[in-house]
């Protein structure tokens, strides 16, 4: 509260020792607040003649108003502050008056309107939603194909963008459990990560292909085909290239598969014969020793 100038109606008469008992000191109602040395205790103002008048302590000079007190009246506050007394001359304002003013009512109405807008569901048939769903599915497939887990992706993103990324975040994105706004933000980050991961994977595959021979998939031969090959092996254990091609066409197998089968079959027979010869030699030796 600011000090106000005296009006023209306020006058002071000089005081002397004779008139001091009859004339009171005329003061403006707000003048006590402007006196120097005010504090929370009762101050005493001494005149030149020794008169003493009690002046109420000032509570406004060094304390901010906690109820939004402005010049010309009370303005409601939007925030809650600690409760303090307003001091002499100003009764405490009633709380409903401060909380339900026009400004606060408009503010609450605006909050309710924004909350209602935030709760409105996003159109699930919009192109943006469909594009997001498509990317989430493609991301999961490509991530698995590259050999990365959700934990791998979360740790990689957390190292660059912060700890808010984790395995749970990636899982919720792939299952479309994030809000539309957060999913759109994460989509841009995952797109960049996926692009770099595929580049690294391509370089690794090129390096492996140059240094190592790619192993062919193991071929499974049916029982009927094995029986036919066994019959051919009994007739000719070393077939020519033309015979191998003919057998491959009859059995619906690749020529290389038939050729390898005959090679393996000859090696197996050789091992069996070697083992049999060793057994016969051992038996003969033992028989001679017994004599």
From Swiss-Prot:
Phenotype when changing residue 81 to L: May be a predisposing factor for congenital dwarfism
Domain POU-specific positions: 124-198
Keywords, in A-Z order: Activator, DNA-binding, Homeobox, Nucleus, Transcription, Transcription regulation
Domain of life: Eukaryota
Motif 9aaTAD positions after renumbering to this chain: 5-13
UniProt comment concerning the protein's domains: The 9aaTAD motif is a transactivation domain present in a large number of yeast and animal transcription factors.
Quaternary structure note: Interacts with PITX1. Interacts with LHX3. Interacts with ELK1.
PANTHER family, per the entry: NETRIN-1-RELATED, POU DOMAIN
Name this polypeptide is given: Pituitary-specific positive transcription factor 1
Gene: POU1F1
